């Protein structure tokens, strides 16, 4: 997990879901509403190839099932395919048995389509934490996962008291890497500079300084993005103003913020980072 600044790898992650995948909103889906994720992922793949970056794609099982060409394209481009669950349901709304079923259903789909069994998981809307869903980590381990990236250490979502850097969760002789997304400490608490919100609302220099500081400390910065965040002209759900703000933000193209970061810093997949940490 540690290394010199010149050799530090950071991680770029994509939560592969449609524009209508917003937790708690029903009535939208394939067959009745247009898909935008294929074209947006294609654009991401082209961009990553142009700057020689490898990423982790956390794919919803329902999306992979509906669009069977998506995961093979991601895998063929050399990226890691990981699990985002099946139905985009909050983990807090699932029983342990239902959570296990979602994992297995998604793993079966992704394994067939990518040729590899996923080793990483990210919960929808950061809905997994050590305090509210402690049972989920053991299930992830038992289902063959080596890492989770769900505990966003923010004051308003995720794991509020969680670490800002990767760590191992121990469970009676078992262990699982927890890899939180990047945040920036402030007097107001941790700020969400590592992804969609960060690209929308914080200045590029602030984000760059956070990456630089982490790398100087021997830590990897983890970024996250949704395909809809590079599609400013795409459709949006008719949500309240607050939920519009949270789910979509202003109509901006996050790639305009991300490309300079990819050119300045080194990026790889989370799976590659875990391999590096465990072989160190």
Spans of model-derived segments:
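Catalytic alpha-helical scaffold of carbohydrate-active enzymes acting on polysaccharides/glycoconjugates
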Residues: 2-187, 203-280
């Amino acid at each position: 997990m540690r290394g010199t600044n010149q050799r530090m790898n950071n991680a770029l992650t994509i939560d592969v879901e449609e524009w209508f995948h917003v937790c708690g909103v029903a009535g939208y889906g394939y067959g009745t509403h247009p898909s935008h994720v294929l074209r947006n992922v294609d654009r991401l793949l082209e961009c990553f190839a142009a700057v020689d970056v490898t990423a982790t794609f956390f794919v919803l099982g329902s999306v992979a099932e509906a669009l069977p060409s998506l995961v093979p394209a991601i895998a063929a481009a050399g990226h890691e395919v990981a699990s985002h669950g099946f139905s985009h349901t909050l983990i807090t709304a699932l029983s342990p048995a239902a959570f296990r079923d979602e994992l297995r259903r998604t793993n079966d789909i992704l394994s067939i389509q990518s040729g590899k069994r996923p080793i990483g998981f990210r919960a929808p809307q950061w809905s997994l934490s050590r305090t509210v869903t402690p049972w989920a980590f053991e299930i992830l381990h038992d289902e063959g996962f080596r890492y989770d990236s769900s505990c966003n250490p923010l004051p308003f979502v995720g794991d509020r008291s969680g670490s800002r850097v990767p760590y191992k969760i121990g469970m009676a002789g078992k262990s699982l890497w927890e890899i939180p997304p990047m945040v920036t400490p402030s007097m107001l608490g941790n700020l969400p500079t590592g992804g969609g919100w960060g690209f929308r609302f914080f200045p590029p220099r602030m984000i760059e300084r956070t990456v630089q500081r982490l790398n100087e400390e021997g830590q990897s910065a983890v970024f996250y993005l949704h395909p809809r965040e590079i599609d400013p002209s795409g459709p949006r759900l008719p949500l309240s103003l607050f939920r519009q703000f949270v789910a979509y933000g202003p109509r901006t193209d996050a790639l305009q913020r991300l490309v300079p970061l990819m050119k300045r810093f080194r990026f790889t997949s989370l799976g590659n980072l875990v391999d590096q940490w465990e072989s160190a």
